[in-house]
Amino acid sequence: MSDKPLTKTDYLMRLRRCQTIDTLERVIEKNKYELSDNELAVFYSAADHRLAELTMNKLYDKIPSSVWKFIR
């Protein structure tokens, strides 16, 4: 594995393995303590994206702004 930090897309592809919000929350909790601050910001962005996908039961390249009102 390279030393290059993962991008939002890299994290999103990994998070798409999570099929439920509960599983996603467990992965978020685990990574909260393992990632640096910079990596965590990128990871949280991808996690929010995946949460929107799970909530709407659809995959998105870019989350429409109208979807965010349904996310807790």
From Swiss-Prot:
Alphabetized InterPro entries for the sequence: Hemolysn_expr_modulating_HHA (IPR007985), HHA_sf (IPR036666)
- The signal peptide stretch is none
The record's annotation in Pfam families points to: HHA (PF05321)
Q: Which UniProt keywords apply?
A: Transcription, Transcription regulation
Asked if Transcription regulation is a keyword of the record, the answer is: yes
Family matches, as Gene3D superfamilies: HHA
* Phenotype of gene-disrupted mutants: Derepression of genes that are usually coregulated by H-NS and Hha.
Described by its record, this protein's role is as follows: Interacts with H-NS and in this complex might contact DNA, which could provide an additional surface for DNA binding to the H-NS-Hha complex; may not bind DNA in the absence of H-NS. In vitro improves the ability of H-NS to bind DNA under a precise set of conditions.
- What family is reported? Belongs to the Hha/YmoA/Cnu family.
The subunit structure is: Interacts with H-NS; crystal structures suggest each subunit of an H-NS dimer could bind 1 Hha monomer.
* Name listed for the protein in its UniProt record: Hemolysin expression-modulating protein Hha
Which species is the source of this protein? Salmonella typhimurium (strain LT2 / SGSC1412 / ATCC 700720)
